[in-house]
Amino acid sequence: MTIQTMQVGPIMTNCYLLCDEDAKVCALIDPGDEAERLEQWVARSGCALRYILLTHGHFDHTSAVRPLLEKHPDVPVYIHQKDCVDGQSGELLFTRVGPENQRYYKEGDVLPLGGLTLRVMETPGHSEGSVCLLLDKEHVMFSGDTLFRCSCGRCDFPGGSYPKMLSSLGRLAALEGDWRVLPGHDRETTLEGERRMNPYVRQGSAR
């Protein structure tokens, strides 16, 4: 397994390329901008693009989806159904994505990627349909805009909720053991570090 990070767009969104190099398959997580760079990135990996996975529907995590599909017309795009409307622009994400590509995931769904398995955890707060994507065996999570290093995502966009954010952070903190946390912005962190240092996680854990 390899995980690479590329920061894209004016808000420096972290897009992740998750590869199972043995099976030669990969997934793009939160392709927010700069589709041509991302396409070249996938090509250099030598892996076939199996999924495009979205932690939520905001423009800075989804804007490269449509141009990527022009090169990969058979690749499914996954998002939680509650986030198929962009909470910032009000734009329907899937007016840009044809019905042949759109897929919805929910709490507990699992997505196989070669020998890897991604599990979906619903984590509303930043948006109504925010999710985290968990590699349980490897203890790696893609936290989107739910959990950041010593912080959490904004809750003042349409569909956001601070009480729901705290509940989601409490659920993440309750995961067993330590985890590598790969957020939608800024540097990666660890769940154990956030349990100790993140005031929002500590508040969520106390609920």
Where are these regions (language model features)?
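Hydrophobic residues in well-ordered beta-strands that form the structural core
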Residues: 29, 77-81, 142-143, 183
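Conserved beta-strand hairpin/beta-sheet module of binuclear metal-dependent hydrolase folds
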Residues: 1-45, 132-144
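Short catalytic-loop micro-motif centered on adjacent basic/acidic residues
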Residues: 26-29, 51-53, 120-122
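Conserved S/T- and glycine-rich ATP-binding loop of Class I adenylate-forming
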Residues: 18, 55, 123
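Short Gly/Pro-enriched turn/cap motifs at secondary-structure boundaries
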Residues: 6-8, 102-103, 122-124
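Active-site HxH/HxHxD metal-binding segment of metal-dependent hydrolases
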Residues: 33-116, 196-203
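Metallo-beta-lactamase
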Residues: 24, 86-93, 117-207
